[in-house]
UniProtKB/Swiss-Prot annotation:
The lineage of its organism: Eukaryota, Cryptophyceae, Pyrenomonadales, Geminigeraceae, Guillardia. This is Uncharacterized protein ycf80. The keyword Hydrolase does not apply. The gene is ycf80. It comes from Guillardia theta (Cryptophyte). One of its GO terms (cellular component) is chloroplast. The keyword Chloroplast applies. Keywords: Chloroplast, Plastid. It is found in: Plastid, Chloroplast.
């Protein structure tokens, strides 16, 4: 069982070293744009996974302008601040979400942390000097105007595959060895419920993304692999992309009476190989 401990996130440490040279990777393209000192525009999928960016025509994408919050200091407040509910997910966790959190405690995911056990965040460079006036303006925007993220956002990445997280760490070390030496960074294993909480409860302009096991996506999109699995009717995918994190479900049937008598619940796997092995056993 994965131990569940408290993690914090920091916008200070190793926030300017996320600049990669591989422009063919859509994730790297996004991070490059976030770290640019130019007012760039980035095309993101509207209702598809970020990894599908390379395969979508322009009319299926949304053009996002990376700019600071509205300079209109006299914007009318849209709501009153609440000290008793979260701004991103006011009703989290519901009863159903509590059950999900409990189930996710045994699922490992990986992220990059510093020596203070703070999650390393990729932050955009501010286009203007962040003085006390800008701080007050942003505070007002966050508490009285903010309804969803627009413009610059900070991103914390989690990975289903440890090797992908280690590759990400390696790129960080290559681009900013001095910063890494000062704060220390390493791959941390945590439980998936921690990511779920951060994803739902993060403050304005801070988002946590879960990166799928890229090898698993490659496997399920392979022609030979497709013969072993069937896709859910609502799953969005094509021959070159797959939305979200692949989850494999084994449903007990009457052909295996012993198993059916023991449990009528579906078994869920995050790796196709484990799913196949389970099918062979039962």
């Amino acid at each position: 069982m994965i131990s569940n401990f408290n993690l914090s996130y920091s916008l200070k440490h190793v926030s300017s070293c996320f600049i990669f040279s591989d422009n063919n990777d859509p994730i790297n393209k996004l991070i490059n744009s976030l770290n640019s000192n130019l007012n760039l525009k980035v095309r993101l999928p509207s209702d598809y996974n970020l990894l599908a960016d390379e395969f979508l025509p322009p009319n299926q994408s949304v053009l996002i302008d990376f700019k600071d919050i509205d300079d209109n200091w006299f914007s009318k407040a849209k709501h009153l601040p609440s000290l008793f509910s979260n701004r991103r997910s006011p009703y989290f966790p519901t009863l159903a979400q509590k059950h999900i959190l409990e189930s996710l405690k045994t699922v490992p995911v990986y992220t990059i942390v510093n020596d203070l056990n703070e999650i390393v965040i990729a932050s955009p460079r501010d286009l203007t000097n962040f003085n006390s006036f800008n701080w007050v303006k942003r505070f007002y925007n966050d508490w009285f105007i903010w309804e969803k993220d627009e413009g610059n956002v900070n991103i914390g990445l989690f990975f289903m595959n440890r090797e992908d997280a280690e590759l990400y760490l390696h790129q960080i070390c290559l681009k900013d060895p001095r910063g890494v030496e000062n704060v220390g960074v390493n791959v941390k294993t945590i439980s998936l419920d921690t990511f779920y909480k951060l994803n739902r409860l993060s403050p304005p302009r801070l988002q946590f993304k879960l990166i799928a096991d890229l090898q698993e996506i490659k496997n399920i999109l392979n022609v030979n692999s497709n013969s072993r699995v069937s896709f859910h009717p609502k799953q969005k995918y094509d021959k070159n992309w797959f939305k979200g994190i692949p989850i494999f479900i084994y449903s007990p049937t009457v052909t295996n009476l012993d198993w059916t008598l023991k449990s009528n619940k579906n078994m869920i796997f995050f790796q196709e190989m484990m799913h196949i092995m389970f099918q062979k056993i039962y």
